[in-house]
Amino acid sequence: MTDNTRLRIAMQKSGRLSDDSRELLARCGIKINLHTQRLIAMAENMPIDILRVRDDDIPGLVMDGVVDLGIIGENVLEEELLNRRAQGEDPRYFTLRRLDFGGCRLSLATPIDEAWDGPLSLNGKRIATSYPHLLKRYLDQKGISFKSCLLNGSVEVAPRAGLADAICDLVSTGATLEANGLREVEVIYRSKACLIQRDGEMEESKQQLIDKLLTRIQGVIQARESKYIMMHAPTERLDEVIALLPGAERPTILPLAGDQQRVAMHMVSSETLFWETMEKLKALGASSILVLPIEKMME
């Protein structure tokens, strides 16, 4: 029998989001062996079960209340949402937060040797895609009629195979499109991974665990976006040094033994510290500049 006291989280078993989802759970302190082929993996230190499934199954598992949480790409979530609404359903769920990985874009692509004069170029054309509802919504808003060719894989080969005139598919670098004689012409949807929760009443113990998990996820994301910076800075130019780090909190200032002209500065910065910024800091007289990653962070 299913233990309803344990929090059930669905994540992609393998694919684009799998490794990042696994890393996120690990950095949140959830001890779990996700390197087996088992469908359900149980955490060692928390009442959490991880269901490892296909990514396009995750929205349905959450919307149908089979699992409590799901880590899923917004593109897959939105496609399932539109699909269910088209069937007259009223799917319910909560988006708890957007995550900092899984970024991609859903784009239209056409053969390189064909002219492109905007979306109207697709009027009456046949378009291959794995996202028919997202494609339809976009082109309907443009008032463009088209024929959809549903493919669940290798969408980029459709024009060469004579199956379609254009495609609508996920793009990261564009290298796959180029290798198949295609070019990206229009972005119709931008996506990242997100954490979603089922609708309906949640047991108090589960909700407390979800709140704890959200706090840890926030800490992990903040840590990844932040750096711990240490340097020696001239006392007369402290304000200028701090101004170069607009994302920083007020720094900790420490005296340097035997040096009245400089101080040691320690700070957490939420800004990416580029080489150019470090060079500007050095030009202001800063020295011994160290930029360190942060493992965990909680405000």
Curated annotation (Swiss-Prot):
It catalyses: 1-(5-phospho-beta-D-ribosyl)-ATP + diphosphate = 5-phospho-alpha-D-ribose 1-diphosphate + ATP. GO terms for molecular function: ATP binding; ATP phosphoribosyltransferase activity; magnesium ion binding. The keyword ATP-binding applies. It is found in: Cytoplasm. Its cofactor is Mg(2+). The keyword ATP-binding applies. InterPro entries: ATP-PRT_HisG_long, ATP_PRibTrfase_cat, ATP_PRibTrfase_CS, ATP_PRibTrfase_HisG, HisG_C, N-reg_PII-like_a/b, N-reg_PII/ATP_PRibTrfase_C. Transmembrane segments: none annotated. Its EC number is 2.4.2.17. GO terms for cellular component: cytoplasm. Feedback inhibited by histidine. Equilibrium between an active dimeric form, an inactive hexameric form and higher aggregates. Interconversion between the various forms is largely reversible and is influenced by the natural substrates and inhibitors of the enzyme. Catalyzes the condensation of ATP and 5-phosphoribose 1-diphosphate to form N'-(5'-phosphoribosyl)-ATP (PR-ATP). Has a crucial role in the pathway because the rate of histidine biosynthesis seems to be controlled primarily by regulation of HisG enzymatic activity. Belongs to the ATP phosphoribosyltransferase family. Long subfamily. This is ATP phosphoribosyltransferase. The gene is hisG.
